[in-house]
Amino acid sequence: MPKPTKGPRLGGSSSHQKALLANLATSLFEHGRIKTTEPKARALRPYAEKLITHAKKGTLHNRREVMKKIRDKDVVHVLFAEIGPFFADRSGGYTRIIKVENRKGDNAPMAVIELVREKTVTSEANRARRADAAQKAASAGAQEVTAAAAPQAAVEPEAVETEASAETAEAEVETAEVEAVDEASAEEADEATEVEKADDDK
């Protein structure tokens, strides 16, 4: 169940506060910036940004929701045709509040609330800094991968050479064994031949 915000209302009643915020939002969308008291500016900011979010979606339902609060059709047209598309790539923070000198007479704290129309130098610098940091991180990661792969590549030829030398040694041993067997069989054949000759002589 929705409940009213705690604390005093602007204007003294709920209906007066709704009308006050609607009129302030209409003036803000029409002129781009307005000067009002600081409490009114802080109350207007979320109210106006929700209307801008409706304008970004741009459907008929959103237009009818905005028309419930902003009764000036020309201002609604500007909101949906210009302001909404301008903030299409921005996910929030469509307005800014700047404190100014207190009002003469009653010394009320004053502020200027305006639409953020320009791209600030700070945001551009932050974006460039983040891009540079991402590139440096990517290059550092690539260097680490290359450095890790180099020792493995150096170890692999050594392992191949070791395996080749082991295979060569095994082949030499097998060859020596075969030669020894051949020599033994040749000696046995010679001995058998000599025995046969001796028998023939007898």
UniProtKB/Swiss-Prot annotation:
PANTHER family: LARGE RIBOSOMAL SUBUNIT PROTEIN BL17M, RIBOSOMAL PROTEIN L17
Domain of life: Bacteria
PROSITE patterns reported for this sequence: RIBOSOMAL_L17
Family membership noted in the UniProt record: Belongs to the bacterial ribosomal protein bL17 family.
HAMAP family: Ribosomal_bL17 (MF_01368)
One Pfam family this sequence matches: Ribosomal_L17
Lineage: Bacteria, Bacillati, Actinomycetota, Actinomycetes, Mycobacteriales
GO biological process, one term: translation
GO terms of molecular function: structural constituent of ribosome
InterPro entries per record: Ribosomal_bL17, Ribosomal_bL17_CS, Ribosomal_bL17_sf
Positions with biased composition (Low complexity): 134-168
Region of interest (Disordered), residue spans: 132-202
Biased composition (Acidic residues): 169-193
Description of how the protein assembles with itself and partners: Part of the 50S ribosomal subunit. Contacts protein L32.
Identification of the protein by name: Large ribosomal subunit protein bL17
GO cellular component, one term: cytosolic large ribosomal subunit
Alphabetical keyword list: Ribonucleoprotein, Ribosomal protein
N-terminal signal peptide: none
Disulphide bonds in the chain: none
